[in-house]
Structure formats: C-alpha cells, structure tokens
Amino acid sequence: MSIASTQADKKSSNHPDKIKISGVILVDKPQGMTSQQVVSKVKYLFKSPNHDSKKAGHTGTLDPMATGLLPICLGEATKFSHYQLDADKSYQATILLGSQTDTGDADGQVTAEATISAFDDTMLDKIAQQFLGAQQQIPPMYSALKKDGKKLYEYARAGIEVDRPPRDIILKAIELKAIDEQQIQLTVTCSKGTYVRVLAEDIAKAIGTLGHLTALSRLQVGDFKIDETITLANLEALALEQRQTYLLPVDACIDINAELTLSSEQCERVQMGQRLNVIDQLTNDLQSYITSAIEQHLSTSNKNAAVNQNVEDDNDDNDDNDDNDDNDDNDDNDDNDDNAQQLLHEIPVDIRLIDEHGTFIGLGAVSLNGRLQPKKLIQL
C-alpha cells in the first residue's frame, strides 16, 4: 500500500510550524512557459503560512513551445523522481514541411526552405516503419545538454556549433498521418533522451524536403496519462485543501512492484541507516523477483562483455594435457562457478519497504543473501 500525500504531510524539521506537502501532481503544461517556470508556480500554489513543500522538481523537460503532461514532484516525492526520468514517453506533434528552423520548432528562425513533393498516407506508413526500433540520434544544438560545462543552447545562441556524440534511443511506436499538403501529424512512443524536433527533421528529409515542429504535446510518461492532468489555471482557482486532492502518493513515480514488510523495530533501525539481515523474510516470490532483476541487469549491462570470456588461444589448444591437468581445469571451473554464484547472491536489488500498517516508508536494496541496505527513505 502506498502512503497518500495528505497522510505523508509532516512537520518540517527546518520549519516546525509548517506542514510539509509531499506528493506527485500531473500538470498540463501551457504553451510558452518553461518546465521550471511551471514547477515554481506549482510549488508556490502549495505554499501557505502553514504549508510548504520545501522541494519541487519535474520528471523530464518540455520545451517552452510544448504542452501536455508534466509530472511534478513535491517534498518527499522528489527523492523518487528519477524513476520517471527513465520512463518511456509518448508525444503527438505537427510537422510543417517546406522549411527548417535553427531550433527545430516554430520558436526559431527559418534557416532553409525546400519544395514539397507529393505524399500520401501509404508513403508515410512506409517511412514510419523505417524509424521503428533502436537507433542513434544526434541531439540538437538548441538543448540543455552540456559540453565542457556549458549548455548547448548557449553555444547555439553565440553562433557556435559543437560536436555532439550520438545517443542511443528506441522508437517503440510511430504513426504518421497527412493533415494536408504541407502538414503531417506525428504520434510516437519513445525511450528517454529522444528529441522529437530532430525526429521531425529526419522524417521531413525522408519525404524529400525540410520540416520543423509547429506543435508538440506530451501524452504519456510511464503509466501517467494526459487525461489525468490538471491545468495551472484550474489548479490556481482551487483552495489549498482542494489542490491537495490532486496529489498522488509520494511513491507514485516508482515502478517497482516488489515490497518487504518490516517490523516497527526494523523500521526504526533502517531510519537510522542500519543494515538488516532479512534472509528469513525473503519469500519465494521475492527471491524470484530479485533473481529476475539481477538477470535482466546482467543481460543489458554485460551483453557484450561475456563474448570474449573463456576463449583460448589456438596454440594453447595444441598443448599436451594429461588427466591430472584436465582434473585441475575442472576444479578451477568449479571454483569459478562457486565464486560467480556467490557474487550473484551479493548483488543488491531495489525494493519497496513497507511498515506493519502497509505504509510505504522508502526504498531499500536487498540481495539474495538477505542483506538489506536502506536507500531512500521518506521522513515520517
């Protein structure tokens, strides 16, 4: 069970007279505002003489021109915002063909123009298929990425173009539909780090022309959807108590299903940062979850590392080996297997920590050997 944001409100240690507001709110970002401006506005709206969130942050930037879903974390929820930074995102955009801008969207200056060849939805379907899957994308100059401690858009505004290494992205779903002879509607679900502005330019090139975005709306972030949002105007029109009803629990951003229930004594110990031995509390389901998480981690991070392991030189294959040597080799392999198994049992996996009342108290890292390390805990 998750702790509700209104239940999580506690006295701030720095301001004992103020109740700390914690939770996640899904805002429909208006056009023309930066993401940080929206965060500052929301933080202000949850502040009163008796209330304060202390901290606030979003889970992924939207350009000023863009609208749509912007999850904002307040108070204790900011500790878990990074889980949504890594989540897949869905967008709907409008591409205007025939011209390119320096920013890749309608906020920039037109830098080049081109004629538009005839196209239809059949052609667009074929082009969309070309963009599906894993690929690399070069970030735009007008972005907040940094090079040598300086943001790329600062170089761009100074008329300087710098090399940007391509980044791995995945387009998991994409649809292109003709709006008219000059405009295309793009709907895409993509991995983190994908720039829809760059994708729009690449699609225009595939059609045989140039293009830039004239509209962009984020529809989904992880499991959060646009129809669950509230506009800033509507939020501002509410009283503080009504605003709090739109807050999701502090752990709403966390996409971890496994949980471990701790006794009151164990809760006190983890709140003090102490490690626990919970080997007797690891159910079969929890052990299976940890094992699966370890296997998934190893397959993604070490998929190329294992290729060259245990490869012998051709000359070594021709060496004379007696029975004793063979037995020694088998003994060595057994030792290696034992060591590898021991290491696997020590790999920590993040899980939810729950108290005896079913209240979420934070995250811990637990391994198959039963060691639990407190990781991110909320201040109760």
Curated annotation (Swiss-Prot):
Any one Gene Ontology BP term: mRNA pseudouridine synthesis
Family: Belongs to the pseudouridine synthase TruB family. Type 1 subfamily.
InterPro entries in the cross-refs: PsdUridine_synth_cat_dom_sf, PsdUridine_synth_N, tRNA_psdUridine_synth_TruB, tRNA_sdUridine_synth_fam1_C, TruB_C
Coiled-coil stretches: none
GO MF term list: RNA binding; tRNA pseudouridine(55) synthase activity
HAMAP family attached to this UniProt entry: TruB_bact
Composition bias, Acidic residues: 311-338
Organism: Psychrobacter arcticus (strain DSM 17307 / VKM B-2377 / 273-4)
Transmembrane regions listed in the UniProt entry: none
Pfam assignment, any one: TruB_N
Enzyme class: isomerase
Region (Disordered): 309-339
NCBIfam families, per the entry: TruB
Protein name: tRNA pseudouridine synthase B
UniProt cross-references to Gene3D superfamilies, sorted A to Z: Pseudouridine synthase
Catalytically driven reaction(s): uridine(55) in tRNA = pseudouridine(55) in tRNA
Enzyme Commission number(s) from the entry: 5.4.99.25
Alphabetic keyword roster: Isomerase, tRNA processing
Source organism, top-level taxon: Bacteria
Role description: Responsible for synthesis of pseudouridine from uracil-55 in the psi GC loop of transfer RNAs.
